Amino acid sequence: MEPPTVPSERSLSLSLPGPREGQATLKPPPQHLWRQPRTPIRIQQRGYSDSAERAERERQPHRPIERADAMDTSDRPGLRTTRMSWPSSFHGTGTGSGGAGGGSSRRFEAENGPTPSPGRSPLDSQASPGLVLHAGAATSQRRESFLYRSDSDYDMSPKTMSRNSSVTSEAHAEDLIVTPFAQVLASLRSVRSNFSLLTNVPVPSNKRSPLGGPTPVCKATLSEETCQQLARETLEELDWCLEQLETMQTYRSVSEMASHKFKRMLNRELTHLSEMSRSGNQVSEYISTTFLDKQNEVEIPSPTMKEREKQQAPRPRPSQPPPPPVPHLQPMSQITGLKKLMHSNSLNNSNIPRFGVKTDQEELLAQELENLNKWGLNIFCVSDYAGGRSLTCIMYMIFQERDLLKKFRIPVDTMVTYMLTLEDHYHADVAYHNSLHAADVLQSTHVLLATPALDAVFTDLEILAALFAAAIHDVDHPGVSNQFLINTNSELALMYNDESVLENHHLAVGFKLLQEDNCDIFQNLSKRQRQSLRKMVIDMVLATDMSKHMTLLADLKTMVETKKVTSSGVLLLDNYSDRIQVLRNMVHCADLSNPTKPLELYRQWTDRIMAEFFQQGDRERERGMEISPMCDKHTASVEKSQVGFIDYIVHPLWETWADLVHPDAQEILDTLEDNRDWYYSAIRQSPSPPPEEESRGPGHPPLPDKFQFELTLEEEEEEEISMAQIPCTAQEALTAQGLSGVEEALDATIAWEASPAQESLEVMAQEASLEAELEAVYLTQQAQSTGSAPVAPDEFSSREEFVVAVSHSSPSALALQSPLLPAWRTLSVSEHAPGLPGLPSTAAEVEAQREHQAAKRACSACAGTFGEDTSALPAPGGGGSGGDPT
């Protein structure tokens, strides 16, 4: 498939339509972030069970989401943090009230649409028995994701108003609307309200009328000038709606409008990030290639040394024809990865263990499983106590907890046999995508299904499908990405036409295993139930393809915001499309839940995913392929990748889910913010990767150009806006205080308050700029002291030539530069907990190896010139590597 063509500016930016012929040029689409009165929204309960009768015990709602650690959260930073706009103080400090100004303070925003005019009656927050979004204005508040960042936020001038200034008082609480379709609905409702006011036509009481609010203003009470202004604003708002509706015809769905907008916003954010530093460029490329649905060009791997030798071997003589090719015994249609296992012979309904698996640590396992219904269950301990059978144990206990074995007449021995067979088809030698990850996603899905806002919403069959999908969603995962399989022309990629390769394979294996002996757990379902369950499972597992992330996010956010601007405020979920949309996003949230778990668990998952990435990078290096982003163990920045992953992927998703089930997911967001802050604080302490030119070594393919994103004309203009100046540069600090003040100067610049995503940009910029400034200052000062001319790095083709030239012109300069900069530049995080056995720890093994390599290179460069004592260099595990920075 050919890569998609670059969309035009009009198709990318729905809110930038050009004027029609013969029409006066309209103002740019209104420059504000949409704010609507907070509307009570609830999800319609649809019946909990497929059976007609339910026991009274089952009618009780599930317990709300609880934290497994059950710790006191009164002192947690996330709960004390007030809700900050994204970005916050970085973009101005203007004050004001977005709701008090009426039409006089009208602003315009190129992304979003017109401000609701003063004639519109706000909706009052009313109590609702179901799901209420932002019901209380005085609740704990936090930062918002980049989705709420407007085009005007890129303006660094002091005139730019902070979005904090537009938050209204408690009496006029508002929600922010960012999806295009919800904005059009809100705008049309505003036009309708203004029309009624201007014409004195009474508004009939129907679903389009506000549920509550102040008494409508009478036209007689308005001055002529006010009426004229209101009429002009109403006409302008209607014109904007027409422009948006004219562009809708090119889209398959209204949610795709939001998807295109979000992708464009993310591309713009990643473009800024990629320009900051090498590590920022790598993080940007990783996020773009993993979470944006793009068709990348297939890379043909260069032949290895053995293949070259085969090509150079003498061809057989004509008298000796080559042997005929061996035919493939395995047809393309055959599902690969299946094993012949025998678990059914030793199992029957009478000898099933208490927790579904045999263990000699039953009491310890029972203690851990007390947290089965809580967020943050320590799945690592469960696996240890269950003899490595965490997936079977968790699935068995959840089915018992929800009484699904009885409801669907699933034989217990069949259930356990299938789960043991399924778990055996997860690869134990894969660091992350193994049965432990599947068990974690399964338990997380179970907890999300039990959230009070979703009580009595989904049927038992839908719950069964969601749990089954979570259990099989990564079965037979080989530990490499879809793109790796495509680039290597694997059989799986050929079979599934490069589309969601692994996800299709997981489904095929999961359903194929049902055909094994005594493994069909759905044998007593009706034909219609089986067909319905299979369709739902396929939809949910395919949604775990991370390249579909932005589409899933846009679908969910459009659904939530559309209900925010409607007066009914009821999410009916009365059709398959809406119901499966919520279930798809639920499993997707569970699949991306690692950063929302307690920090000690999150760090273990990070160690595992990075180990898997590095293993893939090693395989790509062996094949002579370009190493995928974040897969090069010599250059990957673990902490920065996690901050970017949270800012651009995890936070927007969980923020939207929290809106859907408010307030049930608030503590999850608090944990996510705390974990993000921890990894952000670790950036300045972890060793920076060595120069990429040196780390790759000879014989490796050249580095690709800086990762670039397609920008529209509007976005290119924004790129010209200069970044805010850092208060104190490294050179000023060196001049004023000498080398002893360098570290304080760095602390001062990093301590500069900024928003989450902007913080990651600034740290990466500081890393590159400070390193360059310090190197220049060192060389200049030492060259002046020896009377030689300073050496310019760009006069040489490589860093090695530059170092040699400096050593000849000023040995003392190199003596200072080589050992000091790597040691001073960054310090690693203290290891409060050891890394996993056999896996690199984020700040211990991986970072110590980097520092050790940097020290060896510095030593080898110095040894032949001035005999520097190598004992002065920082050693791995010391103050400059994996040790405590204090």
Curated annotation (Swiss-Prot):
Keyword Repeat: no
CDD domains: HDc (cd00077)
Involved pathway(s): Purine metabolism; 3',5'-cyclic AMP degradation; AMP from 3',5'-cyclic AMP: step 1/1
Binding positions (Zn(2+) 2): 474
Record organism: Homo sapiens
GO biological process, one term: signal transduction
Binding site for Mg(2+): 474
A GO CC term attached to the entry: extrinsic component of membrane
Cofactor note: Binds 2 divalent metal cations per subunit. Site 1 may preferentially bind zinc ions.
Annotated Gly residues bias: 93-104, 876-886
Cross-link annotation Glycyl lysine isopeptide (Lys-Gly) (interchain with G-Cter in SUMO), location: 358
Protein name (database record): 3',5'-cyclic-AMP phosphodiesterase 4A
